[in-house]
Structure formats: C-alpha cells, structure tokens
C-alpha cells in the first residue's frame, strides 16, 4: 500500500472511532460491541506507530499523554470566564430580574430565559482553532487559567475535532467537568478495597482528578463534562439565542445537559427551580442550584456586565441540605487558644451527596440551648453546603437512655484542667504550650503567611516536630539544625536546607507581624497593627494598662484585658526574650500620631477590585495608618468602598446599600493629603 492509501486508511479509522465515541459517550447509544471498538482502536495505533508521519494531535489515540507535565502553564482566555451572582430567595430573584428589565431599551418586554442545572464541578474553557482542540484551561481568575489540555483530552466525550465541515476559525467552549454520582461511589469503593485514598465528594474528586500533573491519572478517573456556553468566536455567525447556541454545541459534538429548559418570566424561572429542586436527588450528577440566562444574545449585550458578573444571568442556589441521623458520641478538639470544641460523632448519613459522620456542636451554650444529648436523633445540615452542623433534636425519638453531654474536667490531649468562665460559652484547656494540641496550632499560626511567614513549615511537619519532642516552644524552631530536620520522614537534606533558609529569612519582620504571630487572644491582624503603631516595641506594651489600650481604635475592653494578661505572664515574656535573642528583629519606628481630621479616621472601609498603583496589602496598611478599620465584607455599617478595576460582588452590594464608593484616583488623593 502506498502512502496515500495508508493515509486514507488512517483517516477512515479515525472517523469511524470518532463516530463510535460520539454515540457511546454523548448519545449513550453504542453502535458496536466493545470488542469491535477495541479492534479498530488497536489497528489505528499500529498504523500510527508504523507511520508516525501521519500521526495528528486530533487522533483518538492522543487523548492521553504518557509524559507527566512539569507544571501547569498559564493560559489567557480570549473572552473572560465570569462568575455568576447568586440569589437565594424569590425576592432576590425578583430584584435581579427587575434590575435587568430597567436597563433594557424596551423595559416592558416579557423576558425569555434559558434555564440550566448548576453543576457542582470544575469550570473549564476549551479552545478550538480550525475545528481542532488546541488547548484547554481551568477558569483560574477569570482572565487566566491553568493549562489542562492533556487532562481534558482524557475525557472521552470531549471532541478532539468538531463534528462539522465548516468550523469557526476559533471558538471557546465552556463546560463543567464532573464525576457522576454512581461512578464516584464505584471509584471510592474500589479505592477502599485497594487501601487507596478516597474522595469526600464528587466535586473534589473531579477537581483533583483534572488537575493532575500526570494525565494518565486523570484518564483513570471517571470524568464527564456538560457544556454550557460559548466564549470567543471568530469567523462564524452564531445564533442570537443561548438555547440555539447550546443546540449548535450538540451539533459540534459536545454533551449539553438534558435538563436545560426554556422559561418565560419570573414564574417560569421559579417553576424550573422547584422542578429541579424536587428532582435533585434523582439526578445522576450533583447540583447546588440552577442558572437563569436571558436567552436573547442581543439583550445580553445590551445589559453587559458588572465587574466579574453578567447582568443577564444569575445562579439561584438551593438551600442547605438536611438529613436525620443518630448522635452516638461526642469528642472534644483543642484549638490554638485552648478552646475545647465539642464534635458530634454520628451514624454516617448522606447529606447533599456527602457522607457525614461528624458535625460541629459549636459550644456548650449551643448544646444547652438545643438540649442535645448522646443517643438523640438529630437533624444535620451542611451549612453553606460545606460544614455539617447539628441543627436540632427530634425529641419524640429521644431514647430512655439518652445521656447529657458533660464538659470534660481535663484536657483530652494533655490532661490539664479545663475551665469555663461564667460569662463565656467556650471552655478552655489551661495547659498552654504544654498542651501539644495548642502548641501545634500555635506553631501553625506563628508560621502562617500573615505572621512570620515560614515557608515550608506545614501541619504535617509541625506534627512530627511536636510528637517527636523536637520542638517544645516557639523559639525551638530557630534552633533546629540540618541533621535533625534531614533525618525526619519525607524530609531529606534539600527540604531541610530550604526550611532553615525560610526560618532565617523570617527573622527580619515587622513589629505588627510579630505581635500577630504571638497569637494573643482577640488580637487579629488589624489589632496587631494598631498596637504596633502606638507602642513600637515590647517594653511599651508590657507597661500598657487596660484603660490606655481601650483608647485605641479597634481595641475593646476584652481585647485590652487579654493584651495586659498576656504581657503579665512570665512564660510569655521568656518566649519573647528568647525569640529576640535568636535574631528576630524589625525596623525601629517612632510612635505614630494619627491626624484625626483625615476622612478615613474612625471609618469602616472595604477594598474591592485591583488598584493599579499599589497592592491590596499596601492599601490596607495606608488605611490602618490613618485610623480606619478595614473590613472584608460590605454591610450597612460600611462607610466607604474603595473600588479598583474588576471590582466584584462587594461593589454590587455597596451600590444596593447606598454605601459611598471611592474610585482609585479619589482614594489616592485622600490617603496622600
């Protein structure tokens, strides 16, 4: 057979296999037995091995690369992948639609919506040039994502070439990668049998599987995808309807959710919401709400975008899922400040698709208020679909032998006394750093990014250092040596040297970071900055009184008493002195006198978006230096919102609440005046 004949045979096999793939993975209608498919696939492989000059990147054999990537490279999206604004109630949905209608050229028209399930997976962007899949990326920050091309190719229902003879010059196809419920359960069952790691939920499994450096691992996972939209498109006339564009994607060879529906007006949207809510547990995939999009593309273009969210679409989230189960025991966990937190151990129950066997009880006031007892049948909710909590007790199911939950007299970790102050809901272990649980959490906080920032000192290594008796106090970290570190499991000489370098680098810090790192109760990042600005050094704080501290912005009576108590404890001062002797230092500064006439003094300010002249932390530092309180969320108590480019949902909320919005130019004038 000559070269032309060989090339034609290869193309025939490729077309045949693509057809089989499409019917099997997209239409769920197998055309041939598996054995016949395998024979065709093997024949194609043999041809390509024998005649590599005819191997092309869109061949079905190229779905998996055997060579692991060194790292994920950044990929810029041609058209940004925007997030959706969320609504949780009917009133919020009505307000969203009302705002959209008011911005249209013809506000009295009846709106038609494309309604889709909101899959709980990982959003991806696939780029096709001349009909060939050239690269794929995660959403990332909306503008730039991670290159996952090799991994996307392992998903059999993703076409490597569009099923049309006249494809667009370039098109971006957006979709959600997920793992079906049944496949997730089967995968976890196999993993348990093999003693391998299992996943907590399908969403985590999908995200973890897709972001593997080795695409062969991705290929071993049961990944699937539904496509939901088009980004950039060049040299191709798209329909003026989102629903018609979804039909076009089907023609191109993509899977589109069969649950997509057309709805008219708000009533149609609410009907779809109730329909999907009722059907949620019967669906083969996880969803956490529904998405409404105005169907007309021309109307979408009229409405445009607010920062990172479109005005023409929103996600209507489902309420937290609740289930019933039995509370069989209560354990106690110890935090950084000694807080003893009760944790419910439950008979395992599936809540919103996740098996829950533990739930927070918050504190003893909550236990008393809800009258929770061991043996009770309780209602469990995944708060925010993430953190399981005990909501209430079903009293009529309470057994005769139900037992009261008692506060332990001694710490479950170190055996020290557990004390609960009369006016506090939280009980605490008094063991301090003698308690291994507190020491571990304290070390983790001390090393964190906003504290001393000791890169490479993570929770696993901290556990080793404390459990092996290598570290007994914070200062012991700075006396670690290469031999000790290198001898630890999974450490090695290179990692040990890197950690020692990070420890040395962390010695040069600032007074506010050092104070924050000490973990004084009720003193967060902002409070530490206020203290550092007014006291400059440890000696000044040692002499501070509660009354004096309370005159400072953002320091209340509780925080003030904790500061005075902390610096009155001899063992705390010993640790501080030892840390300073080991080389921790910061630039000396003069006591700052804040001009109380500046416009930010005493005001609550929220930063959102990107400032072109400075980073978020620098802007925050300037505001704090002017006596402002910088908050992470917008509320009715917010005085100003400083809005940079690509400002997000905080800007929307500020507008809705009537909060004053300051653009970057005005912000710079105020802080520099």
Swiss-Prot record:
Its cofactor is Mg(2+); Mn(2+). The keyword DNA damage applies. It is an enzyme of class 6 (ligase). It comes from the Bacteria. Zn(2+) binds at residues 411, 414, 429, 435. The keyword Transmembrane helix does not apply. Its EC number is 6.5.1.2. The active site is at residue 118. One of its GO terms (biological process) is DNA repair. Belongs to the NAD-dependent DNA ligase family. LigA subfamily. DNA ligase that catalyzes the formation of phosphodiester linkages between 5'-phosphoryl and 3'-hydroxyl groups in double-stranded DNA using NAD as a coenzyme and as the energy source for the reaction. It is essential for DNA replication and repair of damaged DNA. This is DNA ligase.
